[in-house]
Curated annotation (Swiss-Prot):
Comp. bias (Pro residues): 135-147
Keywords on record: Metal-binding, Repeat, Zinc, Zinc-finger
Chain intervals with Basic and acidic residues compositional bias: 28-40
Name by which UniProt lists this protein: Putative zinc finger protein 132L
MF GO annotations: zinc ion binding
Region: Disordered, residue numbers: 20-40, 128-151
Top-level taxon: Viruses
Zinc-finger ranges (C3H1-type): 44-68, 81-106
Length: 239
């Protein structure tokens, strides 16, 4: 008979086995005031009478004492009864609304199809299809997007003043080259400063009756209407 050697075990505290030398700080201890607050929060409702009744001296007793009321029982939530089959005792059934089965086809609950309105097996035009589940209506179409705004394109054109009043009694003098005015500056911030520059060009153009405009027709009308003491109706333009 072979004797088996018995292994000897040394008794070690369990804390030494799970101790981590890398932890430099220990978990914070709770103060006694915090422990009392936690114990009070753990007591939700007292639902049993204390056997010591008035002689009980514990302030944190979890049982009811004389003068304390029993907590009210929570009311069960009313669950919606979904009837999926017709009652086979429709004519003889006396349960009425409490019957778990339907007494009319309108009471039968049909679960919704997981594919929703995208189901390809649903019927069309109020005709039954292969799918026996209910299908919601498709969402309404999104409103059409507004048309893009038309950008005002700048045009380069020349106009000639054919009937322009004289300036200070002098006849207009024709120059070799006509000044060029750019009216696309109306949307910029320094409008007043540039307006004075364009105004001087307009006065210069009056001398030779011809001017080249770089901008839109609407901008040209605005610049003439903005000038004080000027009436655009007295100008005649040939484009």
């Amino acid at each position: 008979m072979v004797k088996q050697r018995k292994t000897k075990y040394t008794s070690l505290p369990l804390s030494s086995l799970f101790e981590d030398a890398s932890l430099s700080t220990k978990s914070p201890k709770r103060e006694p005031s915090q422990e009392k607050e936690i114990k009070k929060e753990e007591i939700i409702k007292k639902n049993k009478p204390c056997k010591y009744e008035e002689e009980c001296k514990r302030s944190d007793c979890v049982f009811l004492h004389p003068g304390e009321k029993m907590p009210e029982k929570p009311k069960p939530k009313e669950t919606e009864r979904r009837k999926t089959r017709m009652c086979k005792y429709v004519k003889k059934c006396n349960k009425g609304k409490n019957c778990p089965f339907a007494h009319d086809e309108s009471e039968i609950y049909i679960p919704e199809c997981r594919y929703g309105y995208k189901c390809k097996k649903q019927g069309k035009d109020n005709e039954p299809g292969e799918c026996k589940f209910s299908h919601p209506p498709p969402p309404p179409p999104s409103p059409p997007s507004p048309p893009p705004k038309e950008e005002i394109k700048e045009e380069i054109f020349e106009f000639e003043i054919t009937n322009f009043p004289t300036m200070n009694g002098e006849e207009p003098v024709a120059l070799e080259s006509s000044p060029t005015m750019d009216f696309s500056y109306l949307a910029e911030e320094d409008f007043l400063q540039k307006f004075e520059e364009k105004k001087s060009l307009i006065e210069e153009s009056e001398k030779h009756r011809k001017c080249t405009i770089n901008g839109s027709i609407d901008d040209m009308m605005k610049i003439f209407e903005t000038m004080e003491g000027q009436d655009i109706s007295q100008y005649y333009f040939n484009f």
